[in-house]
Amino acid sequence: MWLSLVILGVASAIVNVSTQESCTTPNGETATCLPIESCKIFWDYVVTSGADPEINSFLRASLCRQGNYVVCCGSTLKFNSALPDRTECGLQDDFKVLGGEDTDLGEYPWMALLQQTKTSGAKSFGCGGSLISDRYVLTAAHCVVSSSYTVTMVRLGEWDLRATQDCVGSGSYQYCSPPPQDIGIESITSHPNYEKSSRGVFNDIALIRLARPVNRNKYVQPICLPLPTERTPVGENLLVAGWGATETKAQSDKKQKLKLPVTDLPACKTLYAKHNKIINDKMICAGGLKGKDSCKGDSGGPLFGQTGAGNAQFYIEGIVSYGAICGTEGFPAIYTRVSDHLDWIKQNVRV
C-alpha cells in the first residue's frame, strides 16, 4: 500500500477529516472530500495496483488540499473524454520527407491560425495553435493575453492564405480541399502562472474552447498530447510548421515545415543567462541553425514529433514561445514543454 502511495508522488501522512467538505472533481463532478481510505474507488486502486500514470495524475489533481491524502471522491478514476483517444489523434496521410519547404495539401491537419482583432477593428492572423480535440486548440498564453488585440476566431484546414480554395494538380488530376473552417471562440483559459517579463516568458500555455466542434475530415484532425514522460533526446529532430516569417518576407502564404534539433537544456540555460533570461525545466530548447527557426507568425504553434515512419502518429511536445532574432545561428528558440502541463490541460478541458 505504502509503495503505491509513494508512486502517487505525494509525500505526506494520511490525515483524518472531521467534516466532509463539498468539492469539484477534475472532471467537473460535484463530490465530497474524504480521506483516501474512505473513498472506495481510489482506495481499491491504491491497494491493488497504483501503477497507472493517468490515474495517478487524476488522483493528484483530485487532492482537496495539498499536503494530505484527502481526495475529492467522485465516480471515476480518470479524466473525462473531452480529449480524443490516442488511436484517434495525430493521424495524417503519408507525406514526403521534410526539408524546410512548403507543406503538402492536407499535411499536419491539426495546425490552427488565430485571428487577432485590434482595438481599431483591423484583423490579421498573428499566431498559431494546435487542435487537440474537437473543441480545443492549444496555444501560447502570450498569443491570447494582450491589451492591443483580442483573439476572435480560429481557422482550421488552411493551407494557402492567397487561395479562396486550396487545390493541387490540374485538369482531371486536380484535387481540392474543402474550405477552411472558421470557428468562433467560446472561452480562453491561459495558465494562472503565466508571466512575461524582462527575464523571460513562463508557463506560456493557453487553451481556446471553440464555439462549436470542428467537422473532422482529412484536412482537420487533432494532434496527440504527449505521454507524461515524453522527452526527445538531445540532438534528435522535432518538427515545426506554420505560416511564419521566411527569408524574403514577413509571412509565408503557404504552410511551411522544418526539422529542428533538440538542444542541451543546461547549455541553453547558460546561454540565455548571459542575456539575463531564465530558462527552466518546463521549457524545451530547439533549433539554433542559421536561417532556420520558428518565427513570429508561428508563435503558439506546435513543436511536434512522430512515433514512427510512414503513417505515423504525431504528438505535440512543445509550444512556440520566444527566442532571439529568428534564425540566429547558435541561439535555439524556446518552447513550452507540454508534458509538464498535462495535468493543467486535463483539468481545464470539458466535453
Swiss-Prot record:
Record's function text: Serine endopeptidase which, by cleaving prophenoloxidase activating factor PPAF2, is required for the activation of the prophenoloxidase cascade probably following the recognition of pathogen-derived products.
Domain comment (free text): The clip domain consists of 35-55 residues which are 'knitted' together usually by 3 conserved disulfide bonds forming a clip-like compact structure.
GO cellular component terms given for this protein: extracellular region
Site location (Cleavage): 96-97
Name listed for the protein in its UniProt record: Phenoloxidase-activating factor 3
Subunit relationships: In the active form, heterodimer of a light chain and a heavy chain; disulfide-linked.
Lineage summary: Eukaryota, Metazoa, Ecdysozoa, Arthropoda, Hexapoda
Post-translational note: Proteolytically cleaved.
Domain Peptidase S1: from-to ranges: 97-350
Family the entry assigns: Belongs to the peptidase S1 family. CLIP subfamily.
The species this protein was found in: Holotrichia diomphalia
